[in-house]
A protein has these predicted regions:
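N-terminal secretory signal peptides
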Residues: 1-23
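Conserved hydrophobic/aromatic pocket- or pore-lining residues that grip, position, or stack substrates
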Residues: 84, 106, 128, 134, ...
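Short glycine/serine-rich loop/turn segments
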Residues: 126-266, 319, 434-454
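Structural helix-boundary/capping segments
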Residues: 90, 168, 172, 216-323, ...
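Small-aliphatic-rich amphipathic alpha-helix that forms the alpha element of a beta-alpha
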Residues: 421, 453-479
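Short, well-ordered alpha-helical
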Residues: 15-16, 21, 26, 30-152, ...
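Short helix-loop capping/hinge segments that flank enzyme active sites or metal/cofactor-binding pockets
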Residues: 126-146, 303-317, 348, 366-421, ...
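Acyltransferase
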Residues: 77-82, 111-114, 327-353, 377-382, ...
Length: 523
């Protein structure tokens, strides 16, 4: 069967039958051996000494910084890739961010990038850059499991559209990143829980936890995550990095394992706003294979990041800002607001639907569980025993949602969206928390069922994250300080539909006044 035939069978965005292939555990063993051989005896190239650049810390450089070095041929993609593989080998045994390291593939792609760049055929800012992706993006011939035992050893017959776009941009794939089971909240016991590099006792976010940890710890220069109720923004918050959830339909979901098709978004996770804009521009755009894909032109955000922000408006709702948030975080976000005003942005008072937080959460659970149950119809309940405790219970709850209940939830969603979108229409960004602060969590707690994990959900302050998934509007999460204990604080900029440029310009302008992006965990 050729690739086109396989694509037809995969048009449900990912939940096809698991294919036979090499086991994930065997692949990890084989690839680790390749990594050790590729990275032995790694030494710093002389250009770093000449330019007073610290090669030992290049893993914490931004994507944009190393992209400049690649473009000027002051470093090669192979050197960068070998350095990243060596760091993964040295550090990730404790952090568990990677589900699979694709060393051989990465080095082959890096060699190709070096040849093209040397020939004057540089494709753009991602060319030769080592990146990683959440393990729900189809990668042809490379295991993709989505944190699901039921998809163990699944070898996708084609690449997700986002992977095709990354490859076309010349990116180098370091590997696939760990995540919660099925992109929900709990983990299957056969999978490792990624460890927050700021503190092993701290929540690492869900569900793109591996993406957040790897990006924060300098184990890739950018990663992809998915967001259904906050799953890009919460790990970005927890790990002190930048996370961007684009407008629904801006980035194709084709070839991405679904959680809930009307809520799922794919977006970049990086160490700077400029980097997020670069990855967004590479992966966004119309895709005929995704019926929800938008035909709107993708803006060239990178060319306008440095622009004046005096024409931009920021919305603030003091009561919404404070709802459930600790005082330290509130103060940090107020400083963001003051800074944006001081450099030209106009403050506008808005009224966010904070009083509907319980209705919002209940409606989200109804819609998400119903759609998740439909997405897993091929394997649940027929293989229910292969699911982890939490996700099995979540799918069961979805099986009890009637079509009538789902339709009623859809009407409530549209009502809440009208309130939310009306306020967003007044501004370029609403400034608010992205989901609280990283909190302490007991080891292994996320292996439990719904009752055990419910307190975790509440601690994430879902009223800050769920509205943008409901409405499909873009948001940007970025660091805005640290607590006295050294825990990262983050702020969220929630924009109107297709408002990626505005939130990135505001985020970039704020970022230039601070040094949060230069502070990294001690790993």
């Amino acid at each position: 069967m050729d690739n086109n035939d396989q694509k037809g069978k995969g048009s449900d965005n990912g939940c096809c039958s698991a294919a036979n292939g090499i086991s994930r555990r065997d692949a990890t063993r084989i690839i680790s051996t390749v990594t050790a051989g590729a990275c032995s005896g790694l030494s710093a190239p002389s250009i770093f000494g000449a330019k007073s650049l610290n090669f030992d810390a290049i893993h914490y450089a931004t994507l944009s910084e190393v992209s400049e070095l690649l473009g000027s041929r002051e470093i090669s993609s192979v050197e960068l890739t070998e350095a990243q593989l060596a760091r993964i080998d040295a550090v990730d045994a404790e952090l568990h961010s990677y589900a699979l390291v694709t060393a051989e593939l990465a080095l082959a792609q890096a060699r190709q990038a070096d040849r093209e760049i040397a020939a004057g055929n540089r494709r753009g800012p991602l060319h030769g850059i080592p990146i990683a992706v959440k393990d729900l993006c189809y990668t042809q011939g490379v295991p993709t499991e989505g944190g699901l035992k039921v998809y163990e050893n699944f070898l996708p017959p084609f690449d997700a559209t986002v992977m095709t776009k990354l490859y076309e941009a010349g990116a180098v794939l370091l590997g696939k990143l760990n995540m919660t089971e099925g992109a929900m909240v709990g983990y299957h016991r056969d999978f490792e829980i990624p460890v927050n590099p700021w503190g092993a006792n701290l929540f690492a976010g869900v569900s793109s936890s591996g993406s957040g940890v790897a990006t924060a710890a300098g184990l890739c220069y950018a990663s992809l995550g998915s967001d259904t109720g906050g799953s890009i923004r919460l790990p970005a918050m927890a790990n002190g990095i930048v996370g961007m959830k684009p407008t629904y339909g801006r980035v194709s979901r084709y070839g991405v394992m679904p959680l809930a098709e009307s809520l799922d978004h794919i977006g970049p996770m990086t160490r700077s706003v400029r980097d997020a804009a670069a990855v967004f521009q590479a992966i966004a755009g119309r895709d005929v294979n995704d019926p929800t894909s938008l035909s709107d032109e993708v803006p060239n955000i990178l060319s306008r990041l440095d622009g004046d922000i005096s024409s931009l408006r920021i919305g603030v709702d003091e009561s919404f800002l404070r709802l459930g948030s600790p005082e330290g975080l509130v103060m940090a976000i107020q400083k963001v607001i003051n800074t944006l005003q001081s450099i030209g942005a106009t403050l506008v008072e808005v009224k966010m639907p904070g009083e509907f937080s319980q209705q919002l959460r209940d409606t989200w659970v109804t819609i998400c569980s119903y759609e998740a149950h439909k997405a897993h119809a091929a394997t649940y309940p027929s293989r229910a025993n292969e699911y982890g405790e939490y996700f099995r219970e979540f799918l069961h709850s979805g099986s009890e949602v009637s079509d009538s209940d789902y339709n009623a939830a859809g009407r409530e969603r549209r009502r809440l969206n009208r309130i939310f979108e009306n306020e967003l229409s007044k501004v370029d960004a609403v400034v608010c928390p992205s989901g609280g602060v990283p909190f302490e969590i007991a080891p292994g707690a996320q292996y439990g069922g719904m009752d055990a994990i419910s307190p975790v959900l509440s601690s994430m302050l879902p009223h800050n994250s769920m509205p943008a998934d409901f409405a499909g509007t873009p948001t940007l999460t970025l660091p805005c300080g640290f607590s006295d204990e050294g825990v990262p604080y983050s702020v969220q900029l929630m924009g109107p539909r297709l408002g990626e440029e505005g939130i990135c310009r505001l985020g970039y302008a704020y970022e230039q006044t601070m040094d949060w992006q230069t502070r990294h965990p001690a790993v």
